[in-house]
Amino acid sequence: MNPIVKQFKYGQHTVTLETGAIARQATAAVMASMDDTTVFVSVVAKKEVKEGQDFFPLTVDYQERSYAAGKIPGGFFKREGRPSEGETLIARLIDRPIRPLFPEGFLNEIQIIATVVSVNPQISPDLVAMIGASAALALSGVPFNGPIGAARVGFINDQFVLNPTMAEQKQSRLDLVVAGTDKAVLMVESEADILTEEQMLAAVVFGHQQQQVVIEAIKELVKEAGKPRWDWVAPEPDTALINQVKVIAESRLGDAYRITEKQVRYEQIDAIKADVIAQITAENEEVSEGKIVDIFTALESQIVRGRIIAGEPRIDGRTVDTVRALDICTGVLPRTHGSAIFTRGETQALAVVTLGTERDAQILDELTGERQDTFLFHYNFPPYSVGETGRVGSPKRREIGHGRLAKRGVAAVMPSISEFPYVVRVVSEITESNGSSSMASVCGASLALMDAGVPVKSAVAGIAMGLVKEEDKFVVLSDILGDEDHLGDMDFKVAGTRTGVTALQMDIKIEGITPEIMQIALNQAKSARMHILGVMEQAIAAPRAEISEYAPRIYTMKIDPKKIKDVIGKGGATIRTLTEETGTSIDIDDDGTVKIAAIDGNAVKEVMARIEEITAEVEAGAVYTGKVTRLADFGAFVAILGNKEGLVHISQIAEERVEKVSDYLQVGQDVQVKVVEIDRQGRIRLTMKDIVSKAENADAQTDIVEE
């Protein structure tokens, strides 16, 4: 086994691509490495098309192995389970730029499996997996119009940084991944700290230029180790069947696509489709339904795209840059901490905010290390939102991806945990959908966060843009419908504030999208965003001054770090008693910061007073009210200042001689005691003799507490 290796410098890192030694029964396999982060990528492509196959069955699986980071998985089974949210997102990241590069009509099944086998905590595996998948596909010989390159772009000290390390990313105002061929950008996924449109576009162009070294290296590897190109020929179009479908459907489809209401339009289109299938199959039973549907869909695309290029009104009658009618309601759910309904045309999101304590934070045990997430964003897309029935259960890949995009859009305006000591969860329920539900989630989340009293830096709005391009003519569409997304050449989503962009996602289905076209799309998106923000600000201009009465109040206090063990108590007994008796939640940091959360403010005050008592220093000569905890032949033990136990010797219980302690004291009895001495071991000697009057005792105790 003599592997073929290609090594090249990529920014500050060294990338190695190796093939020919492992998984030789796969169609192609590549071991891709970047500075000790290694991902093994296999491609298996079936030579024969499954009978009746009418779509391209491409599957991308990305899996992280715990051994890659020298760890053993947790849990009962001690092995990796179903894909995590992070693994699902990276699988989508690999899939999105390669899917458009397979030719139309290619229906052979392909499976790509990317397995992380070694990880350097400073190098994220996602980029390595993308490069490995591109190389494996290019080597496989399947009809693939690649290879692609991939680059991560950071923005540190007003400079673009290629493939920043994990440490550098913490200082970066931008996390942008761009993928494309040698000629064109195909995909962008990014999160930004309110950068301008010009900076975002420059980052995309920078990343695309820098990744050319990857594309050239893969091409050189293919020359050495590539398998023969498949002798695949695109199926010849059935012109007779195409003309037959046109004759039956073209005029009627043209009329249907002037119906502005989605459900009515779909009913009409479904009726036309059923009629076309019935007529054609009645004449020729050998024609497959799938083939007719494909031609019918292509005809729909021609009609819609032709009208847009010709400058005619869009499907719902709008001009190219018009945003659909907006409707906003805040505070719609009485017992939640914050809520809003955002409606844009036939797309609607119900966004709900819940405030929690730090113990509600999500602990993410990733290969690159454990981290805590205090801002959670979940997106749900139930089948009723599009008038359908379907399975309801765990989130699908699309829901996870849309939720992450919406979270990226809002993250830049969220306060830090020191500014607002709450864990924040946003849930976006899509109740209606006709395009751009993820951007509706951004708008709804921004409104609900303000309704909840979360001190966000500013409002955020999102907009989805589309593109129709025919040869040299192109039209950029604002606020696309679901049909325009499906039939167009680009899905371009931008979220941001009045001053800049917070998230940008782009998926391009064709080559030839120039920076000029992207600039026009960004500028048009900015105009739409300003319009939406204006309407949102009329509904709620700033975060509410007070959080919901049903949300927990979080108060902080400082104690001496040496006293933390006293507040926690033996085996957690003291803190458990405090929380159970007062109904509060208590978290203590190593620096002595105590965070107390409760819906009832009086409960918080009680806990704070008790913690102050527990952490107070016992003073010799001071008088305290204590509780008898246990009796002995030689005296009684009394707890003062919460849980500090001292001894009242039998000779110190009363002025007269005491024969039996139980004649004078009982367990649980409250008594006045004076501190005689605190010895070197910290033991407290108490006396009940020579105690001043009760009134003076009370004054003395008050003085102690006030100090």
Swiss-Prot record:
Keyword ATP-binding attributed: no
Record has tRNA processing as a keyword: no
Record Pfam families: KH_1, PNPase, RNase_PH, RNase_PH_C, S1
Gene Ontology molecular function terms on file: 3'-5'-RNA exonuclease activity; magnesium ion binding; polyribonucleotide nucleotidyltransferase activity; RNA binding
InterPro entries: ExoRNase_PH_dom1, ExoRNase_PH_dom2, ExoRNase_PH_dom2_sf, KH_dom, KH_dom_type_1, KH_dom_type_1_sf, NA-bd_OB-fold, PNPase
Catalytic activity field: RNA(n+1) + phosphate = RNA(n) + a ribonucleoside 5'-diphosphate
S1 motif domain ranges (all copies): 621-689
All copies of domain KH, residue ranges: 552-611
Primary subcellular site in the record, as a coarse category: cytoplasm
Quaternary structure annotation from Swiss-Prot or TrEMBL: Component of the RNA degradosome, which is a multiprotein complex involved in RNA processing and mRNA degradation.
Similarity comment: Belongs to the polyribonucleotide nucleotidyltransferase family.
HAMAP family xrefs: PNPase
The name this protein goes by in its record: Polyribonucleotide nucleotidyltransferase
Phylogenetic classification of the source organism: Bacteria, Pseudomonadati, Pseudomonadota, Gammaproteobacteria, Pasteurellales
